[in-house]
Structures are given as C-alpha cells and as structure tokens.
Amino acid sequence: MAVHAQDTKKAHALRLIKRQGIARARDLEAAGVAVAYLRRLVEEGALEQPARGQYRLAGAAPAAGHTIAVASGIVSQGIVCLLSALRLHNLGTQTPHEIWMLIGAKAWAPVNPAVPLRLIRSRNLHEGIGVEERTIEGVRIRLTSPERTVVECFKHRNTIGLDVALEALRELIKRRRGKTDDLWRIAKVFRMQNVMRPYLEAAA
C-alpha cells in the first residue's frame, strides 16, 4: 500500500513538471509536492535542477530559449533585452553567451547564478512600453518588443556595438515593410530619435 502511495506521489510530481517544462519549487509545494520529496527525485535521477529552486524531468530535451527560461526563473522581475531579445525575435546574427536582462536600479541580483547573466540596471524600466510576454518551458518570459529592442540597441550602442544596432534596424524595417510608426514612438520615449534619425532615413 505504501509503495502504491509513493508511486502515485511520484507520478503526480512528474506529471506537474512535465506539463510546465521547468517548475519552481514554490509552485510545486503549492500543488502538494514537498521540497524534500523533490530532492529525493533528483537523487533518484528522475529530476534535474537547472537552477536553484527549479526542476525539470531528467534527460528532457531543452526547448529553444532554454537558458532564457532558466534565467527568467531566477530573475523573475527581469526583462529579457538587447542581444538576448534580438535572438528571441530572430533579428540579426547575434548568439550571446550571456542572458541580457533589464532590472531595476536597486533590484536583487543573484550571486553565482546557474546561467551567465548580463544585468542592465535602470531607474525606470518603462514596463508599460514595448514589453511582451512568452512562455518557454512553462516559465513566463518578459522581453522587450522588436521595436523597443532595436531602440535600446542604439541606446546601448557603445556597449554592444553600432553595427549590431544597424543590422537589427535594417532587418526590422524589412520585416515591417517600411512601417516605422511604433519604432518612432518608442524612440521618442527613450530620447533616441535624433540618434536614430539618419540611420532610419537611410534604411527606409
């Protein structure tokens, strides 16, 4: 009887994690799965821990954007931006080895995270402007929209390189078939319209 109960408990835990892809310990606890039991499943080889407080099925093929999902699980208030957002939007040819995330000026930042992070701090995150949501491996991802990503590439051009910003701008204008209204609107919010104007006119 006890063995059957354990099997049912294990099946319940694995089913929850399979559904989510990457599951957080606190969500699993809320669903009735204790952290101590999750540790046991890790020791048995049934689960893996991609990061502290996160669990996935052992041997599960990671989805595209897996490391971004892990990073967003660690820094849940962060916004994926710049090179990592370009990658998710398929703009340009950048393949960053770090996950670029925007966080508040005084926000908590992890020490020795499970994935390499490049955190950009800002006093005003402008969370209501050009921020989208996706779900990867069951984790909610917040990321800058294509237009905001391009604008921020120009804002941080001294860090990432002007060539990266120009490549992304050209591809976005081509994708939008020359329509730049949203791009201009966001450029004004970030006071980048004068910087971007000559490049926009040349690329249009």
Descriptions of predicted regions:
Residues 3-31, 37, 42, 50, ...:
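Nucleic-acid-binding surface
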